[in-house]
Amino acid sequence: MCARGAALLALCAAGIFLSSTRGSESPHAGGPLAHEAYVWQRVWNQPVRDAIKQHASQFAGLTVLNAEVSWKGEQPQVIRVPLDYSVLTNAPCPVGLALRIGPCAASVSANDTATVFLADVAASLVTEASSHRLVPRELQIDFDCAESKLDGYRAWVEAFRRKVAPVPVSITALPSWLEQPAFKRLAEAADGYVLQVHSLQRPRAYDAPFTLCDPAAARRAVERAA
């Protein structure tokens, strides 16, 4: 893979997919982990298309960035990514859509206007994909959520699931969330979650050694989640 192409497909060594069993205790998970990839690009130029065409067959699935939400005060602002559906519908593996949501300073709850707005955005992504004959395997929510807001985030996830059913809704999660009582409720509200095990520790200084993914720390986090 060329240097440019290498930047386009991010291996899921940085994110491990773990299915949550809703409403029941699940047994300890085991076995090999599937290799999947993210396409986290706002601009779909030819190198992005070529990377997918040439390398998607190496993965069990792709998740493509479809929209990003930032906040101006308490008002959400959306940037949509114009996907090339002709490439995605011909991909040799299942394709999921990702909705990225930046940190939210406001409270997170079930009945506020932001929840309704975000659920409508989520539904519109699935509808647009379906109109281009792409049936997404899931909608993945990547929300920079404060640990104090995990219960409110659960209300968002429940709203998203109602809007996009029967498409599954998964979330990304941090290892630090695993210790929070609210996380169990959040995970049970989703159809699955991706444990983000990259950059678990912030560098102590600007010139300190930096590791994108520590395999030993990642394995410990996965064992805790499993």
PLM feature spans:
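Conserved, mostly hydrophobic/aromatic
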Residues: 62, 141, 193
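Short, acidic/polar
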Residues: 43-54, 113-130, 177-183
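Catalytic domains of carbohydrate-active enzymes, especially glycoside hydrolases
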Residues: 45-72, 128-136
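Alpha-helical scaffolding within the catalytic cores
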Residues: 43-51, 75-87, 176-185, 218-221
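Boundary/entry segment of secreted carbohydrate-active catalytic domains
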Residues: 23-54, 65, 80-82, 91-93, ...
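Substrate-binding cleft of extracellular glycoside hydrolase catalytic domains
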Residues: 77-146
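Substrate-binding surface in catalytic domains of secreted glycosidases
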Residues: 158-226
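Active-site beta-loop-alpha junctions enriched in small/polar residues
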Residues: 38-42, 67, 100-104, 144-148, ...
